[in-house]
Amino acid sequence: NMTLLVFKALWGMSGGLEQQLEQIAAAGYDGVEAWAEGIMLQPGAFRRLVDSFHLKLVIAGPITLPAEIEPTLKHYAAFEPLKINIHSGRDSLTHDEGCAFFEQALKTEVAIGLPVSHETHRGRLLFTPWDTAFYLRQFPQLHITADYSHWVNVCERLPDDQHEALALANSRATHIHGRVGYEEGPQVPDPRAPEYAPHVAWHEQQWRDIKSARLAA
């Protein structure tokens, strides 16, 4: 069985933290996704504040170097989140360096006992469909946060030529960032504008395919 949980990111919101959480809860979201480096409270205090609004929690943040993985994931685990989302490595790392990164990340994921997903983010290891496919084939236990807006930006096209890579990525996605990208950036100026209808349709199809893959898992 699969339960779809919808989270609102604190990213881009204005006002104080309590006001933001109140707005998220009032809007009917299941939880909040918070960037760890922007949280001024201690993990326990932040967790209690989130709990007071009956919200679930996803913690997100960057990990660039393998040596940072264990201490950073242990810090994120102290927030007792439902899961952790990572901006992983750098796009300039070799495949050998990237493999060393994910090997350590998966080992630490087991140690902390919380699911970790690695975001398909520009500037990071999973910045293209083909690099992502390489790592997913190397590591069957690796899961991703699908933010394909970055891929459209990096590829400067809707990557329809990447059928195998997309199918593999969709089968390993356990978290989605519902953002629509285009050739010139990771965020279309207005998803309602007719010139971006193909981009919206393409992203929505990937999200449907991810849902189908999760239901079949």
Feature locations, PLM:
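N-terminal pre-domain/capping segments
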Residues: 1-77
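Hydrophobic faces of well-ordered beta-strands that scaffold small-molecule active sites
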Residues: 1-9, 32-34, 55-61, 82-86, ...
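Active-site-proximal loop/turn and secondary-structure-junction residues that shape catalytic pockets
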Residues: 10-12, 36-40, 63-65, 88-92, ...
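Alpha-helix N-cap and loop-to-helix initiation/capping positions
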Residues: 16-19, 64-71, 93-101, 127, ...
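Catalytic-core regions built around general acid/base machinery
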Residues: 44-54, 100-111, 165-168
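Active-site acidic/histidine proton-transfer and metal-coordination neighborhood
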Residues: 57, 61-144
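Acidic/histidine-rich catalytic cores of soluble enzymes
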Residues: 111-193
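A short, acidic, amphipathic alpha-helical segment used as a generic capping/interface helix at domain edges
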Residues: 164, 198-217
